[in-house]
């Protein structure tokens, strides 16, 4: 695919994750941050979260989503800053403009689709917000959206409190939707020559994943079917985490055939009473089955139980911690990497899908405003003009 140019006014995680996926393809990604405000740290607040890696504005939490990107700083509160942005769109032949600020700021900052598309009609514009442009003031924080979209209601023990997922899934889902819909927009542009606007509502994107619960409301479901149930599956029995002599193991029975194979394992033969032969029958005895399963698994090491399940083709997995996940051969050989300015190799998460020709190593994140001067020169600004813009607070870096 042709290398594209993405200019992204981004912060936090949702949009940086989307543009990371473009950077992983070898596209040019320029992250646009604000100029310093009175009394505040400059740029994306995430720059200053976590342990110091090489300097104060490139800390651990900021690194992985922002590798492979350039960084510029423009004051979009000023008309001259907005004019500068529009010039960059043309001079750099920007394909995609992204932002993840609250929609009420679009026109205030001159980044709304109508304004930018008048400057560059073939521009693809993508914005992430909490609930879309109809709710212009709603803040889009992942934990808030997990609560709002019912995810916390569905996560945790049945008799425990609502629980946050261990991964910022709404942020990442929103970023994936930007990635996918930009690709669709590029295909459409190739046919029509026209740009388009993409609005990703984090709430709508999150609700689209409620495919196993939300539709049940029109089928007179029981309350237990649409609330949290710990590690158990609401429909398939037994599917759960069980204790072993040295840890835990997860196993899933998804059919009556798999149940029969389970009860043919000598250790589990005592569970195979006739009423349990069907999933419907097992559902009626689910609490007893979970107790019976745990009574067996707790007597044996995880590796021994896993070997039995593997021989019987029962879906299962140990409960890995994050170091163990990274050490899995299927993951380890696909890890992306970056290098700190002093040459230290840093291993990061793999790409979602292997892409032929994609580089596994991406440049270390740029310092705040590191590329402002170079990008402005590329857009035709002389050094004297750049210095004047800096003195007036229109740019930084």
From Swiss-Prot:
It catalyses: phenylsuccinate + succinyl-CoA = 2-phenylsuccinyl-CoA + succinate; phenylsuccinate + succinyl-CoA = 3-phenylsuccinyl-CoA + succinate; (S)-2-benzylsuccinate + succinyl-CoA = (S)-2-benzylsuccinyl-CoA + succinate; (R)-2-benzylsuccinate + succinyl-CoA = (R)-2-benzylsuccinyl-CoA + succinate. It comes from the Bacteria. InterPro entries: CoA-transferase_III_domain, CoA-Trfase_fam_III, CoA-Trfase_III_dom3_sf, CoA-Trfase_III_dom_1_sf. The active site is at residue 171. Disulfide bonds: none annotated. It is an enzyme of class 2 (transferase). Its EC number is 2.8.3.28. GO terms for molecular function: CoA-transferase activity. Keywords: Transferase. Involved in degradation of indoleacetate, the most common member of the auxin class of plant hormones. CoA-transferase that catalyzes the succinyl-CoA-dependent activation of phenylsuccinate to phenylsuccinyl-CoA. Acts as a rather unspecific CoA-transferase that shows a broad substrate specificity for C4-dicarboxylic acids, including succinate, (R/S)-phenylsuccinate, (S)- and (R)-benzylsuccinate and their CoA-thioesters, indicating a fully reversible catalytic process. Belongs to the CoA-transferase III family. Homodimer or homotetramer. This is Phenylsuccinyl-CoA transferase. The gene is iaaL.
């Amino acid at each position: 695919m042709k290398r594209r140019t993405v200019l992204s006014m981004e912060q936090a995680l949702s949009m940086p994750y989307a543009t990371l996926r473009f950077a992983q393809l070898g596209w040019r990604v320029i992250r646009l941050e604000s100029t310093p405000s009175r009394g505040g740290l400059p740029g994306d607040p995430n720059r200053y979260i976590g342990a110091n890696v090489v300097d104060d504005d490139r800390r651990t939490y900021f690194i992985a989503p922002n590798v492979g990107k350039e960084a510029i700083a423009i004051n979009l509160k000023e008309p001259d800053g907005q004019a500068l942005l529009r010039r960059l769109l043309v001079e750099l032949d920007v394909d995609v403009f992204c932002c993840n600020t609250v929609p009420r700021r679009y026109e205030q900052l001159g980044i709304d689709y109508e304004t930018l598309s008048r400057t560059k009609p073939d521009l693809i514009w993508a914005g992430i917000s909490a609930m879309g442009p109809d709710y212009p003031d709603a803040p889009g924080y992942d934990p808030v959206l997990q609560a709002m979209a019912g995810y916390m209601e569905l996560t945790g023990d049945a008799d425990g409190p609502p629980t946050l997922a261990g991964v910022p899934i709404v942020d990442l889902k929103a970023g994936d939707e930007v990635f996918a819909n930009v690709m669709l927009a590029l295909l459409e542009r190739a046919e029509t020559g026209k740009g388009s606007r993409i609005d990703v509502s984090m709430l709508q994107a999150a609700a689209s994943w409620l495919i196993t619960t939300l539709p049940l409301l029109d089928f007179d479901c029981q309350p237990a079917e649409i609330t949290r149930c710990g590690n158990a599956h609401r429909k398939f029995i037994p599917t759960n985490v069980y204790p072993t002599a040295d840890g835990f193991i997860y196993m899933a029975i998804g059919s009556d055939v798999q149940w029969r194979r389970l009860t043919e394992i000598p250790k589990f033969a005592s569970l195979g009473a006739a009423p349990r032969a069907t999933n419907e029958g097992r559902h009626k005895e689910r609490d007893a089955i979970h107790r019976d399963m745990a009574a067996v698994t707790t007597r044996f090491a995880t590796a021994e139980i896993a070997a039995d399940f593997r021989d019987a083709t029962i879906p299962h997995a140990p409960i890995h911690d994050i170091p163990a996940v990274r050490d899995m051969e299927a993951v380890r050989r696909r890890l992306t990497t970056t290098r700190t300015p002093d040459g230290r190799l840093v291993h990061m998460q793999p790409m979602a899908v292997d892409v032929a020709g994609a580089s596994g190593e991406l440049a270390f994140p740029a310092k705040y405003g590191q590329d402002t001067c170079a990008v402005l020169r590329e857009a035709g600004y002389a050094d004297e003009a750049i210095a004047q813009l800096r003195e007036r607070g229109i740019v930084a870096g």
